Structures are given as C-alpha cells and as structure tokens.
Amino acid sequence: MNFVLLALAILSFPLAFAQFGHFFQQGFPFGGGFQQQQQQQEQHAPGRQHKGWTESERVHCRAGYVCPASLACVPTPADCPCPYPEDIKCVIPDNRPRDEGEGPPFVCVRGDTGCAQVLEFSKPI
C-alpha cells in the first residue's frame, strides 16, 4: 500500500509541475522570471523622470539655463518663471553671500495670501 502511494506521488509530480511550473518560475522571485521582468522595467524607465529634463536637452539656449518645468531660456535658475500662470513667485529673504550669477531663493505659491505667508514663515524663530 505504501509502495502504491509513493509511486502515485512520484508519477503525479511531472503532471503537477506541468500544470503549475510556469507559476513557480514567473510568480516567485527565485524562479528567474522576476529578475527578467525587473530588468525589462529598468530598461524602459528613463533615468530622469521629469519631462522637462529630457526635452531641455533638445532646446538651444544661448542665455545659459533651460528651466525644466517651462523650458524657458533664462540666465540663471533663479530667473525661471513659475510653472503655472496662476502661481506667484515669492523671493525668500536671505542675507547669505551668493556666487556670481546665483539669484535669491524663491518659491512659487498659489492662493489669496500671496507672498505674505511666505515672508511670515521665513522669519527666524
């Protein structure tokens, strides 16, 4: 009786593997399919996710800097416009020395308060 059960188990293994073998190869990380799928995703995913970074390489800018959000050509990154027309560009007060061509820090805000809230939050504690 034990011999029959053992023989039945051994003979049913190829059938089970034929039925579920693909699942074990592709469904779990140890099957090899996971690595192939991950490598395919890495090949299709660009290194730079922001649309402007890839398109800015095609823009010819003599001023020196292409803004990634708007693709505007400006002399320095601080001169970039806000990405949306309804945004307001607020300069953050900063008295530190800057490198040549480096503009003041800024943030783009939206809403009724304008730059007043930015100035309030930028005060030292």
Curated annotation (Swiss-Prot):
InterPro entries: LCL2
UniProt superkingdom: Eukaryota
Keywords assigned by UniProt, alphabetized: Signal
Signal peptide, first to last residue: 1-18
Ranges for region Disordered: 33-52
GO biological process: one example: ERAD pathway
Primary role: Probable component of the endoplasmic reticulum-associated degradation (ERAD) pathway.
Name used for this protein in its record: Long chronological lifespan protein 2
Lineage: Eukaryota, Fungi, Dikarya, Basidiomycota, Agaricomycotina
